[in-house]
UniProtKB/Swiss-Prot annotation:
One of its GO terms (biological process) is thiamine biosynthetic process. Its cofactor is Mg(2+). Catalyzes the phosphorylation of the hydroxyl group of 4-methyl-5-beta-hydroxyethylthiazole (THZ). Substrate binds at residues 47, 196. Belongs to the Thz kinase family. This is Hydroxyethylthiazole kinase. Keywords: ATP-binding, Kinase, Magnesium, Metal-binding, Nucleotide-binding, Thiamine biosynthesis, Transferase. It comes from Desulfotalea psychrophila (strain LSv54 / DSM 12343). It is an enzyme of class 2 (transferase).
């Protein structure tokens, strides 16, 4: 097995043993499912978005996960307050720019968070990620309209520009810091048919980042774990409804050894310009 496969197994074992607290400021649509995904993974979720407590709450957390799915000005303020405290504490921040590129408010809010806080990982689909750069992409709501392969070169440049890790999910996931690129081939076709799978994947990245401070490695192994769980769930599911339940079971039941054997991760060099 490759070193990254072994790291994936070790990261999962660390999550199960340490149960890191993951502070989520996330959207109403996915709060319940995201919390259950984190619990099934082995982490401890907390959903806290009130400005009165976010700075205090993030001090207990192993990572901070920000999701702009159901956005308002007050939530942006909460995210910025929590982010600044997280930066002071050197706590990793994971951003999910849901629907960035679809509306000016979403795009501006995502860019503001990136500008005012040091974000460790940005996880989104290709269109969302590319909307954060100078080239505008064609975002249809929260669905991807650009392939991961089409986004690879731009993502590498954008990762270096923003000095962050970009995790672009699709049929094949791409994770890059602008210098190294990992492709993750785990996943299942039913995953896009369940609301919250992408947002939950972001939260799982937060769990892995809480135990592995090499955030490129953490994001890559997190997506492999989540994708492999999707494959396991797909074998038992008959449609999106049963898949959602089986995914929780697969996350909970997967052993580190199964992850080491089942993850499909390839590394390549980032394209330079």
């Amino acid at each position: 097995m490759s070193n990254i496969s072994l790291t994936a197994a070790e990261n999962l074992q660390q999550i199960r043993e340490n149960k890191p607290l993951i502070h989520n400021i996330t959207n109403f649509v996915v709060m319940n499912y995201t919390a259950n995904v984190l619990l099934a993974t082995g982490a401890s979720p907390v959903m806290a978005h009130a400005q009165n407590e976010v700075e205090e709450m993030v001090a207990f957390a192993g990572s901070l996960v920000l999701n702009i799915g159901t956005l308002s000005e007050s939530w942006v303020s909460s995210m910025l307050m929590a982010s600044q405290r997280a930066n002071t504490l050197k706590t990793p921040i994971i951003l999910d720019p849901v629907g960035s590129g679809a509306t000016a408010f979403r795009t501006a809010s995502a860019k503001r968070i990136i500008a005012e806080a040091k974000v460790s990982v940005i996880r989104g689909n290709a269109s969302e990620i590319l909307s954060l750069g100078s080239e505008q992409s064609n975002t249809r709501g929260v669905d991807t309209s650009q392939s991961v392969s089409d986004a690879a070169q731009t993502a590498s440049l954008l990762a270096r520009e923003l000095d962050t890790i970009l995790a672009i999910t699709g049929p094949t996931d791409l994770v890059t810091d602008g210098r190294r690129v990992f492709n993750v081939d785990n996943g299942h076709p039913l995953m896009p048919y369940v609301t919250g799978t992408g947002c939950s994947a972001t939260a799982v990245v937060g769990a892995f980042a809480a135990v592995d401070r090499d955030y490129l490695r953490a994001a890559t192994t997190a997506l492999a774990f989540f994708g492999l769980a999707g494959e396991m769930a797909g074998k038992a599911a008959t449609g999106p409804g049963s898949f959602m339940i089986h995914l929780l079971d697969a996350l909970y039941n997967m052993s580190p050894e199964q992850l080491e054997k089942g993850c499909r991760i390839k590394e390549s060099s980032a394209t330079r310009s």
